[in-house]
Every structure is written in C-alpha cells, then in structure tokens.
UniProtKB/Swiss-Prot annotation:
Coiled coil: none
InterPro entries associated with the record: Alkaline_phosphatase_core_sf (IPR017850), BPG-indep_PGM_N (IPR011258), Metalloenzyme (IPR006124), PGAM_B_sf (IPR036646), Pgm_bpd_ind (IPR005995)
Binding site for Mn(2+) 2: D14, S64, D440, H441
EC class name: isomerase
NCBIfam families linked: pgm_bpd_ind (TIGR01307)
Keyword annotations from UniProtKB, A to Z: Glycolysis, Isomerase, Manganese, Metal-binding
Protein name: 2,3-bisphosphoglycerate-independent phosphoglycerate mutase
UniProt keyword Manganese present: yes
Cited PANTHER family: 2,3-BISPHOSPHOGLYCERATE-INDEPENDENT PHOSPHOGLYCERATE MUTASE
Oligomeric and partner information: Monomer.
Record text on cofactor binding: Binds 2 manganese ions per subunit.
Gene: gpmI
Catalytic reaction equation(s): (2R)-2-phosphoglycerate = (2R)-3-phosphoglycerate
C-alpha cells in the first residue's frame, strides 16, 4: 500500500439512467455542465443494470438493492425475487419448512394465517404472484381463516394502479374458497425505513387491532374512497376492509416482501419484546416468518436464508491491506454498506463509514438537493487528506426525487448532482486521484409515463452511464454490466481480481 493513497472514488448516482428521449427526461432538461464536459473529454459508455444482467427476471427493471449487490460483488448475484419465483414454479415453495411450520402451528390451534406485504407487480420489494402463492399454500395446509394485509405501491408502479392487484387477490380468494383482504394501507406508512415511527405505528395498529379512520366493504371500495380523498396508492391511509380481523396469539404472520430495507421496521414492531420506539397497545405472540432475512439481529425465522458471497470488493480490499470509506445519506446508507458488502452488516477491517442524515421532509421534492452538498463536503475533505485508497459514495437524489414524479424537482436534483460531481473531480485532480461514475438503475431520465400520461415514479430498465475520470489513456468496452464495476476498480488499483469475481474490467488500453 502506498504511504499516501491517491483515492479511487466510485460515485454511484442512484436512479440516474440514460435515455435518448427528451420527453420527461430530467437529465436532458437540466443544465449539467460538468457531466457534459466529462462525456466529451473522458472515456465513457453505457452499462446494463436490469434484467438477467443483474440476476433478475428478463426485462425486470433494476433497483437499488440489486444494483449495489452487483456493483460490490463483481459477479451477477442471483436475486431473491428470482429465487422465490423459481421455488414457486418448481413447487418447492409449497413445502418450504419455515413457512409450513408457522402455518401448521396456526392451523392445528384453529388460528388465523395473516399474509402481509407490498401488493403490486413492481417486482422491487415484492411481487403479487408471491402473495397469490402464499394464499394457495395456506389453503393447501388447511387454514380456514386467511387474511391479507395489502400494502399499496404507486412508487414502483404508476401512482394509481392498485385496483387490478386488489382484484387479483379478490379473484384468488374466490377461486380458493377461503380468505379475504382485511386491510389496505399505502407503503408510505407500512414500509418506512427512516425511523418515522408515527407512520409505522398506524400500519401496525391497523394490522394488529384493525384500528383505522376509514372502513370499506371491499378493498376496491376502500381504494376508490382513498382516491376521492386525493390519496394515491403510496399514501392510502389505514383502511379496514369488512369485519375486523385482529391478529391474535398463536396466529401465523408471514411478511411476503423479499427486499429487506423497507421490511425491517414493521417486523421489529411485531417481534422485538423490548421494542421502545412507540408504545404498542398489544404485542400478540405470533408465529412470524420473514420471506428473506431482513437483518441478522431480528429474532424471527426467514423462509429463504441469505446466501453468503465470498470475496466481494470490500472484503478483498481489506484482505489486501487497502483502506476504504463508504458514505451516503440515510436513505441509501444501507445500500452503500450492507448491500454493497454482499449482505454483511459489519465493516471490514480498514473500512470506515460516514452517515449523513437525510432531510426530515415529507417527500424529497420539497428539498431536491437532499443532503448531497454535505455528503460532498466529507468526500472532498477525505480526498484532500488522502485518507483512503477507495471511497464509495451513493448520491440518493436521482432516485428519491425521481420517485416523486415531479419534473421541476427532479431537474433541481440532478443539477445539484452535477455540482457535487464537479467538486469531487476538482479535488481528485489536485491529488492525482481517479473516479468511476455510474448508477445502480434508471429513474430520473423518465418522469412521465408515455402510456398513461401520469407521472412516472418507478425505476426504468434503461442502461446507466459509466465514466472514467482520470489521466490514463483508456477506452470503454461495449457490453458491460454492473458486475463489471468491481473488477474495473481492481484493474485501476493494479490488483488481480479474485476467482469469485466473474465480471471483467470495462476499461481497456487504447
């Protein structure tokens, strides 16, 4: 290791895809002189961040968890979405020992099976087909009382698209002859990840005690009433459907989200005896199952155990005596640490982490710069003092403001990013450092939905930029994917890649 590291900085612009279309494209509408200059003067190209290229089903848009897993692993990582879907197709899901044990315990005691999760075809945190399969499993194993607690999307799907998903579940329960939708609530409340416990408590109290300001005879009627209150899917307030279906001691509760970050908080409320972030009216003693492991510290079993990834970038750098910094604001901190490290919570030796709090605003269109300037201050300081060999940073703006669907805010967000990238590039030039700029998936390059005319709030399957910033004479090869980024970094560091990394350097000599 050199005495004064000249850092290699990986800049991940979250949700910053590439599209030639100008319609609803915040990136092309924005003034971005720094990125324009880098595209003209530095080696750059496009790489894939979606579908089979990142271990998702063909055509499936990428997301932040998947993107960071692939970026850090240096290999295509077979995703939980694909694992669960395959298990359902193969029939293994219906024999899953963890789920079956919880359901069988409830059934033998004459208790209910509660299925909860994000009900949509977005495929980012969950998929509605998985919830259908869970209802089928419960019926096959003899459950008489089956209740669905549906979290509505409108973020990874169009803002008002939940009706068809609710109708799918109604049709499923009718076909099975058992089960019904018991509650609906927007993901804004049920799937927080920033310790906004007032939101989480409204979802928990709805599910456990049927406590709700709104009631409806059917899920679709409840949804239509929410639309009449001007609440899009994501923001639908707690609504009880039909008779109360309280969660009781001995019931089974299966959380069908496969993505961890937005499933942890609600899970903790259910299973932690010493939970103190808000006062629970009740904590029923249930047979709780997480579809995947949301965190190693959560005292509940998971149906699909986490697979371990060996020799991810962070581990390999540590084993070779390199120092590294991971930095992001709250919204993406888990991605640049836990997910980038292949599902590992603890830092590697020589790894430091900086968490910058995200602004406490209801939605990020109200503060589109988010905490990017503060993140950049810390990075520039680290570069100037040459403290680390490698710095990995995530800028949340493109994704989080992109999800708002508000074009003006998205333009401000990416213009802020341009300034931040410029500051990093300037600091690196002074010390002889290098950077790679890329993204985990698309979003902010498509802010309007061509087919519906509504705001487009979901991710896209567009390719993402890849830019080398430095003095070497290199060119970008075609056909790169996110899994090629870690091997590219090792190439720049003059290190052989470990055999577990199947990706290949995107940069080649001119």
């Amino acid at each position: 290791m050199t005495a004064t590291p000249k850092p290699l900085v990986l800049i991940i612009l979250d949700g910053f895809g590439h599209s030639e279309s100008h319609k609803g494209n915040a990136i092309l509408a924005a003034k971005m002189p720094v990125m324009d200059r880098l595209y003209q003067t530095m080696p750059n190209g496009l790489i894939s961040g979606s579908g089979m290229d990142v271990g998702l089903p063909d055509g499936q848009m990428g997301n932040s968890e998947v993107g960071h897993m692939n970026l850090g692993a240096g290999r295509v990582v077979y995703q939980d979405f694909t694992r669960v879907t395959k298990a359902i197709r193969d029939g293994e899901f219906f024999e899953n020992p963890t789920i079956c044990a919880a359901v069988d315990k409830a059934v033998s005691a004459g208790k209910a099976v509660h299925i909860m999760g994000l009900l949509s075809d977005g495929g980012v945190h969950s998929h509605q087909d998985h919830l259908v399969a869970m209802a089928e499993l419960a019926v096959k194993r003899g459950a008489e009382k089956i209740y669905l607690h549906a979290f509505l999307d409108g973020r990874d799907t169009p803002p008002r698209s939940a009706k068809k998903s609710l109708e799918l579940m109604d049709a499923t329960f009718a076909r099975l002859g058992k089960g019904r939708t018991a509650t609906i609530v927007g993901r804004y409340f049920a799937m927080d990840r920033d310790n906004r416990w007032d939101r989480v408590s409204s979802a928990y109290n709805l599910i456990v005690d049927s406590t709700a300001d709104f009631h409806a005879d059917s899920a679709v009627a409840g949804l239509e009433a929410a639309y009449a209150r001007d609440e899009n899917d994501e923001f639908v307030k707690a609504t009880r459907i039909g008779e109360a279906a309280r969660v009781e001691d001995g019931d089974a509760v299966v959380f069908m989200n496969f993505r961890a970050d937005r499933a942890r908080e609600l899970t903790r409320v259910f299973v932690e005896d010493d939970f103190k972030d808000f006062e629970r009216a009740r904590q029923p003693k249930v047979n709780y199952v997480m579809l995947t492991q949301y965190a190693a510290s959560i005292p509940a079993p998971s149906a699909f155990a986490a697979g371990s990834l060996k020799n991810v970038l962070g581990e390999y750098l540590a084993d070779n005596g390199k120092t590294q910094l991971r930095i992001a604001e709250t919204e993406k901190y888990a991605h640049v640490t836990f997910f980038f490290s292949g599902g590992r919570e603890e830092p590697f030796p020589g790894e430091e982490r900086i968490l910058i709090p995200s602004p406490k605003v209801a939605t990020y269109d109200l503060q589109p710069e988010m905490s990017a300037p503060e993140v950049t201050d810390k990075i520039v300081d680290a570069i100037e003092h040459q403290r680390y060999d490698v710095i990995v940073v995530n800028y949340a703006n493109g994704d989080m403001v992109g999800h708002s669907g508000i074009m003006e805010a998205a333009i401000k967000a990416v213009e802020c990013l341009d300034v931040c990238v410029g500051r990093i590039a300037e600091a690196l030039e002074k010390v002889g450092g290098e950077a790679l700029i890329t993204a985990d998936h698309g979003n902010v390059e498509q802010m309007t939905d061509d087919s519906t005319g509504q705001a487009h709030t979901a991710h896209t399957s567009e390719p993402v930029p890849f830019v080398y910033v430095g003095k070497r004479q290199l060119k970008v090869r075609q056909g790169g994917v996110l899994a090629d980024v870690a091997p590219t970094m090792l190439h720049l560091l003059g290190m052989e890649k470990p055999q577990e990394m199947t990706g290949h350097s995107i940069l080649v000599a001119e």
